Amino acid sequence: MFASAGQQHPQIVPKEEESILNYLLEVRSSLAKLKQNRTQYLNSKDVQTTYQHVLTKVRELDDIRKNSHETPAKSAATLIHSTELHNRVDSVLDDVFQLLSLCFLTVGLKNSAPATYASLSTVESLLEHLNESNVFTHHDLSPIKERLEEISKIVEQKNSSPAYDEDGNDDRLREIDNERKKNKIEEDLLLRAKLKHCKDEYDILEGKLEEIDPSLSTVMEKLFRIRRGLLSLVASAKKTMSKSDINTNSLLQEQNDLQTNNESLTDDKHLVSQEYVHEKLSVLKNELSELESNRDDSGKFKSLESHQVAEKGQSVLNGLLDDCHDLVNDLSHQKNGGLTLDPYLQPIYEQLIDIKTTLENLMITRRWTLRETDLFSYQKKLNEIDNKRINGKFPTKSQDSKGQSILLYLLRRCYAIIYKLLESSEPVSEALQPIHNQLSTVRRCLLELKRMGGVNNERELYPYQMKLASLDNLRTEGIFYDSDGNIPEGQGILNALLAECFDILHELKVEAEEKAQNSTSSDGSDDDDNGESGIDSNSNDSEPESEYQQE
């Protein structure tokens, strides 16, 4: 996916590449079935084996292309994803690598080189859209730069692929190692090429930022913020459905209840009130007018700090100002909390709003899974929408460019959310994810108890003791195994979480004992009989604790 958005490639496959295409289609189909299979968890060995087999085919494909075409340095470059030779094989291969990358994340191998492919693809799309929009700040770029540096370190590592040392006599492991050694150069070239492309895109964006005079940076930041606010306001609503649409959908609902029972007929989740739009729009318009008044007679912006005019960056700032005025005009004509665009653009707008809303809901939990939340499908949908553009614009018969910037913003926003979801992935295998979720919940509850002042007696902690004991009993000699007897990724994280929960629990118990002793001392000074009763009660409370510790 090295081509810029909207660029089309010939899909004619040379005869010598047809066998590889058929193999990749089979792999893509099997991976698609795998992510729909909810009966068993992914196995890291299976994922690693499939990945190495695909790399072997990639190596064969590279050799075929090098033998068929003149290359400056045949041994030092790869022709995979070459813009000139791009065909259907490359498109299917990209799908396979995307799926495999998500599989590596699913089995908890987040910090392995293959797992970075999906992240790099999303960063690549995000950077291309930021470049087209010309609306970004250092705050937008700094997280991307940090992530690219992290990926660089992973790719630079000699042993980028994880080693499995559970059983040195395992034939499958030896097979993986042999394949890895043969494919190491090809894997390295592919990832480095994709990483270099992202870095080049980033450097272009960083260079654009430096074109603006530092004294105008505050003005630029405010204009960016206003424009983002306007775009966000436009993208937060969906056109209200008419009564006839609702009646039609009611009939469809009866026929397809199983498929659509989770969706509202009126799509209320997308709607915002007209009052809200007007209120937010009024605030942003006032901020825009205030900034606009900070210009000289010739229309050049002054520095907010020194009140001096700097020449460098004036055209960029005035361009941002014009964009903001266009968006204000669009929002002023909104009806029923929604935006009506060109008939050719409206379906794209509706589709992007749906995708964005779904992805934003996922951000609440900061968790995705390969089967329950298929990020690959969302990436494919976004790519399909992106590829409809011609010369950066969505095709329409109208000469009015209204809506183009809004659609691009929605695309960019969706890519950004997918990027955040990928980065929020924990290096824990899906086989251990239920245990990880339970431990995280127990930890959160214990921390909340501690924050609210602890408990009055140890009995209140018994449910947490029992839960932690049951989770601790799932280990065998300190290791969590899956149902097939394998050792999934994420052992360190789970053991650290379990130990932290026990530590917090112990602190709460100590605090509860101190409270009980203080209460006993206070009662004893008033009434000796009550004091003896309190001591007896305290000693009774301690018995279950000793049983738990012995257990």
UniProtKB/Swiss-Prot annotation:
After gene disruption, what is the outcome? Answer: Leads to sensitivity to bleomycin. Bleomycin sensitivity is even increased when CUB1 deletion is combined with proteasome mutants including PRE9 or UMP1 disruptions. Suppresses the copper tolerance induced by the proteasome subunit PRE9 disruption. Leads to synthetic sickness with deletion of RAD6 on media containing bleomycin, but not hydroxyurea (HU).
- According to the UniProt entry, the coiled-coil residues are 174-213, 249-300
Q: Which domain of life is it from?
A: Eukaryota
Compositional bias, Acidic residues, is annotated for 542-551
What InterPro entries has UniProt attached to this entry? UPF0662
Low complexity bias located where?
Answer: 532-541
- rRNA processing among the record's keywords? no
Q: Where is this region: Disordered?
A: 513-551
GO terms for cellular component: cytoplasm; nucleus
Main subcellular location: cytoplasm
Q: Which Pfam families match?
A: DUF2408
Where is this protein found? Cytoplasm; Nucleus
Describe the protein's quaternary organization and the partners it interacts with.
Answer: Monomer.
Q: Which family does it belong to?
A: Belongs to the CUB1 family.
What this chain does, per the record?
Answer: Involved in bleomycin tolerance with links to DNA repair and/or proteasome function.
Protein name, entry field: Cu(2+) suppressing and bleomycin sensitive protein 1
The organism encoding this protein is: Saccharomyces cerevisiae (strain ATCC 204508 / S288c)
